Every structure is written in structure tokens, then in C-alpha cells.
Amino acid sequence: MLENIRLSLQGIWAHKMRSFLTMLGIIIGIASILSIVSTIKGTNEQIKQNLIGAGNNVVRVQLYRTDYDYVYDIGNEGIPQGITPVDDDLYQDILDLPQVEDAALYTRRQYANPLYYGNKELSGCEVLGVDNAYFSTCRYTVDRGRTFVPADFQEFRPVAILDSDTAQLLFQGEDPIGKTIEYNGTALVVIGVVEEQNQFEPVINSLDDYYLYMSNFTAGKVFLPNAIWPSLFAYDEPQEVAVRAANTEAMSQVGTQVADLLNQQ
């Protein structure tokens, strides 16, 4: 054993350059493999963050057409038939699913009419009628004012909450709290401004990335109590469900389970 080690060391010493180049090749090879693995892992993480956002683990379950793979749009396709509201029992079934931390029901109109404040007009906002669990489920924080309280729903108060983008675009730095805006001929008092804790900012490297990740972005969001939604939009929009999963890995499973429950009603 010792003789073999001695002969090996003599061979290395006698061919120092060849031994050095061999060791260098091995080191470079290992470093290249580590670099490739790190690059692939980093790319996968970036794609995952682009597709699902970073940090809030929220899955949105929406009504899709069965013949085409896109979200149902009542503006182009009319009122869907046979879609019933989510009742209390079904909502509780959603909350009881494994890996579900919270859930909220909401209605949404993506291509809404313009929003007015005085002589200012803002187009392109998304309007949502939300329940009392929406802001906690989707990880919104209050920047100014407050969120909805039970009396806002029970008394059908004409109030609205803006996200920070809408507040900035419409009020240009002016404090919006207590101000009256107009939507669909209805006066709404702004009671709060909210921000998402983990805002989705995808990395855009190409035109294809832009269309993939930015096609559904709007000028901002306006939130209304779901109790007053019928007075502005009737009952046209089907309910959607926002579900916060326990972790990123559970999002796909949670989304599928919620969709299955909704399809069974």
C-alpha cells in the first residue's frame, strides 16, 4: 500500500505539467456543472415567480369556457347560464381543504367604465366586488384610511377602496380619503387605499414575455363591498374565488381542488 502511494507521488512529480493540467480540467469540469445547475435553478425560480407572483401564494379560480382555454368574458359572450353563487356550505368546504389558509369570494369586471373625480377621468381600472375576507386573503395592507367593516355590507354603503396605483393616477398626490368619486352614475366615498404586500413585478426579457405576463394588467383596482355590486352591475358577473395556499408547492393542488368543488355545485 505504501509502495503504491510512493510510486504514484513519484509519477505525479515526474510529470508535473500533465498532472497540473489534469487537475485543472477536473476543477473546470466540476465548476461548469455547478454553474449550469445554479443557472437552471435560478431560471426555474424566476419563471415560477413570474407565473405565480412572489410570496403571496394566492390562487384565483375563475370561470373558463369549456371549448376554449380562456377566462369567460361577459362583455363579449353574454351572461353565463347555470352558474349559481357560492353558498355558505360550499365556502366552508373550501376553507376546510388541506393546505388552504384562507379564501375569499369576489366578482370582477376587468374592462370597466371610466372612473371620475371632479373633471378628472381614469379609464382601464379593474373593479371588484369583494367580501370581508378579500384583503387578508390576498395579502393587502392599508396604506391610508381603512378597509370595509360589517356595517358597510349590512347598510349597503356606497363606499370604495382604491389600490395605490388608482389613488395616484386619479388624485395626483391629493389625499383621497373622504373624497367622492363617480362610477356608473353612482357616487362613492373613498374610505381607504391599499397595497399588496408582495407586488408582482415579472422580469421582462422579450416581447413574448411582455404579452405572457402583462396582458392582464390594468391601470389599477377599485374595490367595492359586494353588497352594493348589484346596484352597479346587476348580477351578471359569476363569482370567483381567491384562495391562499400554505406554500407555493401546494398552489396547483389547491387550485384544482377548489375548481372541482365549484364544478360539482
What is the predicted role of each segment?
Residues I28-S35, T39:
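Hydrophobic alpha-helical membrane-associated segments
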Residues S8-G11, I26, Q46, N50, ...:
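Amphipathic alpha-helical segments that mediate coupling or scaffolding at interfaces
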Residues M1-I30:
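N-terminal Sec/SRP start-transfer signal
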Residues L24, T107, Y183:
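Residues that line or immediately flank small-molecule/substrate-binding pockets and catalytic motifs
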Residues A133-T147, P158-Q265:
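Mid-to-C-terminal secondary-structure elements
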Residues K41-E126, L169, P230-F233, E249, ...:
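Hydrophobic, regular-secondary-structure patches
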